[in-house]
Amino acid sequence: MKKLNTQSPDFQAGLKALLAFETAQNPETERIVADICADVQKRGDAALIEYTNKFDQTNAKSIDDLILTQADLNAAFERIPNDVQTALQTAARRVESYHQRQKMESWSYTDEDGTLLGQQITPLDRVGIYVPGGKAAYPSSVIMNAMPAHVAGVKEIIMVVPTPKGERNDIVLAAAYVAGVTKVFTVGGAQAVAALAYGTETIPQVDKITGPGNAFVAAAKRRVFGVVGIDMVAGPSEILVIADGTTPADWVAMDLFSQAEHDEIAQAILIGTSQAYLDEVEAAMDRLIETMPRRDIIEASLGNRGAMILAKDLDEACEIANYISPEHLELSVENPQEWAKKIRHAGAIFMGRYTGESLGDYCAGPNHVLPTSRTARFSSPLGTYDFQKRSSLIQVSEQGAQKLGETASVLAHGESLTAHARAAEFRMK
């Protein structure tokens, strides 16, 4: 891991270098994805079946072979162990409860002229959820993407999940059952994104696509954005821990590992105010790494993009955190709620030593789909509001038409838009 000290004259340069991440798009990936999207848009189900058989090594004869029914999802739920059933239900219940509180409601008011103004909230009609498949499957992603849509009132929640060599993951399908997914198609990759965006003979066009995927899925989401909405194009996972030295070093070490184990380019950073404590955490990491099944990935991640930063105090640590704008921020300090008030930019803020980031990944309640790569400066976690739309309401009274008409007429003539002005003037006495 890199070692930085805020008192060093080259600290800012070192911090910028630490956060620099090459996000340039791969031209070959973009070309392949463009071809796949165009083909699916043109040939529909036939192209989808062809690509699925090719990339997932399946033997689908028709689109019916790629459809799972509610009975299939229920059967998958019944096959998994009781403790896993309970865990999925507990996580879904907590995520639902949290996202209910995010739900936007319609409102209106009437001004002094009797004109009604307001905002009408409506859910999206249909959304698509992309879920990675195979052995590296993430049932938590199903719950985090589908449940907010369900809470928002979306009528159709369509999930696409690849099944390499026909391998279905019962826990993923059980999560779909618990989270209220209405349809499942066993397709993946850019071809699945294209099918959701453009529609095929069997898969209906959706209004928005959410969910994680590989580079091809990310490229496809970028390509179809504008035809449909997307959640975000997420970068590598990130965690930043601010520690005052009161949390056991082993806990902090494992929290850093929890994000580093995702990917060789994931980022784990620790900011402390004591060199002795940073040394203690480093020693804990050296000891605990021996127990990690994904040791190679963790070591590569920490070597590539990990860091320990020595700050002069917690105020400075919080300012650094605001600059970094991390996906996950742990405030492993005393009085964490007070320090949280100093944080302006973070996807999720985990307050206190008992609030491990992994609890948020699975079952705390808030969404784990979070902005990465410093985009928390201007964007937010996935939520119920992402599956709702706002329409402005305007009902002008007869009296209001006189005053508003006069104003509109003057402004319209100023823009040389005569019909605009006349339309307002016709309603004036």
UniProtKB/Swiss-Prot annotation:
GO terms for biological process: L-histidine biosynthetic process. Pathway: Amino-acid biosynthesis; L-histidine biosynthesis; L-histidine from 5-phospho-alpha-D-ribose 1-diphosphate: step 9/9. Substrate binds at S237, Q259, H262, H328, D361, E415, H420. NAD(+) binds at Y130, Q191, N214. Its EC number is 1.1.1.23. Zn(2+) binds at Q259, H262, D361, H420. Transmembrane segments: none annotated. Keywords: Amino-acid biosynthesis, Histidine biosynthesis, Metal-binding, NAD, Oxidoreductase, Zinc. GO terms for molecular function: histidinol dehydrogenase activity; NAD binding; zinc ion binding. It is an enzyme of class 1 (oxidoreductase). The active site is at E327, H328. One of its GO terms (cellular component) is cytosol. InterPro entries: Ald_DH/histidinol_DH, Histidinol_DH_CS, Histidinol_DH_monofunct, Hstdl_DH. It comes from the Bacteria. It catalyses: L-histidinol + 2 NAD(+) + H2O = L-histidine + 2 NADH + 3 H(+). Binds 1 zinc ion per subunit. Its cofactor is Zn(2+). Belongs to the histidinol dehydrogenase family. Catalyzes the sequential NAD-dependent oxidations of L-histidinol to L-histidinaldehyde and then to L-histidine. This is Histidinol dehydrogenase. It comes from Neisseria meningitidis serogroup B (strain ATCC BAA-335 / MC58). The lineage of its organism: Bacteria, Pseudomonadati, Pseudomonadota, Betaproteobacteria, Neisseriales. The gene is hisD.
